[in-house]
């Protein structure tokens, strides 16, 4: 779309505020629905930037990226095009927690997205800051910017990441700034507060970057990987031909001494930071204090681009002053002569209390206003992208007058993520872990396509033809399973000799053995891995599916939207407070709210039953 001089004369379907991983997914979801979109970002050359580690995926997170792809999102597709290394994690722990992680050329990733967005119709990209949301009668209808521009729209999605009233902290310095020296503003924060939203201060951090030419690689361990024939995207045909290595080293006793002697200079320990940091990604200062018994901690060198001129020092996140960072870095094997390209820092920012949100990621206070990404209290590119995609889908549904799309916990990690946020809230940056999912045997890396298919079709992000292709894949697997149950291996067969079989056995039984290579039985079947996983986990999957059905029944028990919780007898005071704040839509949601016990749920069910009986008696 060509840029207009008077944007206030145009009404858009949606405005997306912020061009990070959440914002980009939201934009693509809206464009797929043929809607007219404005993307407001600080710097279009830094779309979906990676201010922290240059990687996508990891335990649970890699499965989220697969789900994003299956749901019609783009993170997996662009990761495949920009990856410089890819590998499986947790292979030895079984298929339930198997995940993909890729090192990404962060510069290429942003360039690919900008290049692709420039081709899109119905999109206007503006470099500006948002100063005020336009709200009337609790409904958003547009916004104003710092450059005095006004945009009108039917819906707004805020995906500001860590940029709202953010401060970069290093030692005693606290500089108003976003990540990577970008602009920040308190205008939107103040506007949200005036609208009655509850904000909280959160904190994250990043390590120093080192010029690769200054590293002594003879003192570190090189990660040597085979070339894996794997991708994030189910549609991708791009395969990595060469793996670029990462490197492993460790902190030393000298490193720990320097940190301990200078703890008071760290922004974290000087009292300069009030925000709560991520539990599962602590700073090096935190690690030394909390795990003082450990003689050393792992440090990984990760290339930021294919050029490999800068290394991200994973494991050394810090808010120490620059002189202390330099002293500390030089005590690490391989970094004795290191030259720092960019010093580490902590960043503190405003985030929304996610209890303010519906499962659609629309706010409860303002209709048509959606929130996604780190503003909702999460950490990580994958968690952000997942929320952006869901917010984009549902903002589109809102504009088109359709029902929101809400992913259940038993169908995806995306469902677990959003359900946790809107029912439990978070007081620290939330990171997805496999342990957060009750049904992780069902929520696997290999079956994300079929789990997301119905949601993608309902969202309009995949066609009926694409949906039927996914269904046909699993029908083919089911037919092959039936065939294998009727085909047998006798003790005289070559296959029997290889696996020391003493009696006749079905091929299905044989393939379910953990020591059997499925390619020996299915050399030419394209979905052999998926079939093998289903065969080996059959009993466990059936059990978890049964448990999931019980949860689904609770999700179907609706709570009246206008229910007066103060009239529910014998509720605990904590349950009353949480119910009034969260206002769960179903008994299933209510049961997962922290502080709510089974007795509270029983009283709630009884009260709803009485209300229904009273209504019937009046008829």
Curated annotation (Swiss-Prot):
GO terms for molecular function: flavin adenine dinucleotide binding. Belongs to the MnmG family. Homodimer. Heterotetramer of two MnmE and two MnmG subunits. Its cofactor is FAD. It comes from the Bacteria. FAD binds at residues 18-23, 130, 185, 374. Its main location: cytoplasm. One of its GO terms (cellular component) is cytosol. The gene is mnmG. PANTHER family: GLUCOSE INHIBITED DIVISION PROTEIN A, PROTEIN MTO1 HOMOLOG, MITOCHONDRIAL. This is tRNA uridine 5-carboxymethylaminomethyl modification enzyme MnmG. The lineage of its organism: Bacteria, Bacillati, Mycoplasmatota, Mycoplasmoidales, Metamycoplasmataceae. The keyword Hydrolase does not apply. NAD-binding protein involved in the addition of a carboxymethylaminomethyl (cmnm) group at the wobble position (U34) of certain tRNAs, forming tRNA-cmnm(5)s(2)U34. It holds the Pfam family SAM_GIDA_C. Keywords: Cytoplasm, FAD, Flavoprotein, NAD, tRNA processing. Disulfide bonds: none annotated. GO terms for biological process: tRNA methylation; tRNA wobble uridine modification.
């Amino acid at each position: 779309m060509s840029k207009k001089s008077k944007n206030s004369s145009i009404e858009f379907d949606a405005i997306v505020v912020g061009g990070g991983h959440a914002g980009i997914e939201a934009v693509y979801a809206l464009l797929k629905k043929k809607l007219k979109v404005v993307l407001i970002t600080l710097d279009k050359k830094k779309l979906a930037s990676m201010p922290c580690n240059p990687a996508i995926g990891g335990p649970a997170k890699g499965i989220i990226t697969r789900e994003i792809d299956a749901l019609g999102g783009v993170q997996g597709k662009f990761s495949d095009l920009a990856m410089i290394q890819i590998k499986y994690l947790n292979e030895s722990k079984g298929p339930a927690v198997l995940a993909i992680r890729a090192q990404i050329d962060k510069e290429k990733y942003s360039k690919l997205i900008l290049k692709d967005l420039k081709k899109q119709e119905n999109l206007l990209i503006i470099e500006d800051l948002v100063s005020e949301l336009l709200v009337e009668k609790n409904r958003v209808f547009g916004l104003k910017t710092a450059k005095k521009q006004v945009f009108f729209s039917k819906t707004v999605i805020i995906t500001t990441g860590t940029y709202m009233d953010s401060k970069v902290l290093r030692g005693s310095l606290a500089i108003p700034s976003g990540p990577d020296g970008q602009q920040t503003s308190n205008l939107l924060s103040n506007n949200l507060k005036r609208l009655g939203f509850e904000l909280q201060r959160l904190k994250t951090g990043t390590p120093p970057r080192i010029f690769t030419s200054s590293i002594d690689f003879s003192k570190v361990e090189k990660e040597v990987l085979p070339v894996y024939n794997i991708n994030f995207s189910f549609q991708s045909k791009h395969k990595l031909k060469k793996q670029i290595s990462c490197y492993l080293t460790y902190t030393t006793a000298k490193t720990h001494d320097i940190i301990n002697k200078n703890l008071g200079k760290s922004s974290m320990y000087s009292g300069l930071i009030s925000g709560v940091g991520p539990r599962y990604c602590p700073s090096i200062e935190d690690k030394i204090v909390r795990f003082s018994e450990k003689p050393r901690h792992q440090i990984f060198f990760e290339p930021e681009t294919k050029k490999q001129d800068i290394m991200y020092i994973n494991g050394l996140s810090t808010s120490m002053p620059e002189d202390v960072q330099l002293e500390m870095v030089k005590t690490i094997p391989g970094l004795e002569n290191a030259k720092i390209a960019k010093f580490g820092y902590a960043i503190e920012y405003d985030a929304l209390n996610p209890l303010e949100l519906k499962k659609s990621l629309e706010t409860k206070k303002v209709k048509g206003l959606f929130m996604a990404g780190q503003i909702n209290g999460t950490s990580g590119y994958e968690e952000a992208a997942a929320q952006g995609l869901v917010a984009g889908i549902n903002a589109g549904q809102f504009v088109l007058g359709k029902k929101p799309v809400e992913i259940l916990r038993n169908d995806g990690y995306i469902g677990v993520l959003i359900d946790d946020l809107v029912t439990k809230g978070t007081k620290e940056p939330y990171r997805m872990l496999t342990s957060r999912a009750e049904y992780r045997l069902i929520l696997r890396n290999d079956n994300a396509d079929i789990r997301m298919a119905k949601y993608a079709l309902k969202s309009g992000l995949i066609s009926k033809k694409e949906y039927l292709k996914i269904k046909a894949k699993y029908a083919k697997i089911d037919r092959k399973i039936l065939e294998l149950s009727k085909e047998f291996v006798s003790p005289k067969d070559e296959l029997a000799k290889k696996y020391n079989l003493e009696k006749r056995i079905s091929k299905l039984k044989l393939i379910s053995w953990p020591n059997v290579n499925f390619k020996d039985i299915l050399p030419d079947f394209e979905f052999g891995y998926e079939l093998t996983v289903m065969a080996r986990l059959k009993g466990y999957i059936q059990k978890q599916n049964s448990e999931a059905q019980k949860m689904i029944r609770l999700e179907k028990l609706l709570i009246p939207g206008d229910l007066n919780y103060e009239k529910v007898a014998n509720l605990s005071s904590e349950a009353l407070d949480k119910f009034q704040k969260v206002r769960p839509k179903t008994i299933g949601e209510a049961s997962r709210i922290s502080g709510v016990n089974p007795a509270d749920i029983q009283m709630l069910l009884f009260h709803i039953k009485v209300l229904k009986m009273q209504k019937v008696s009046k008829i």
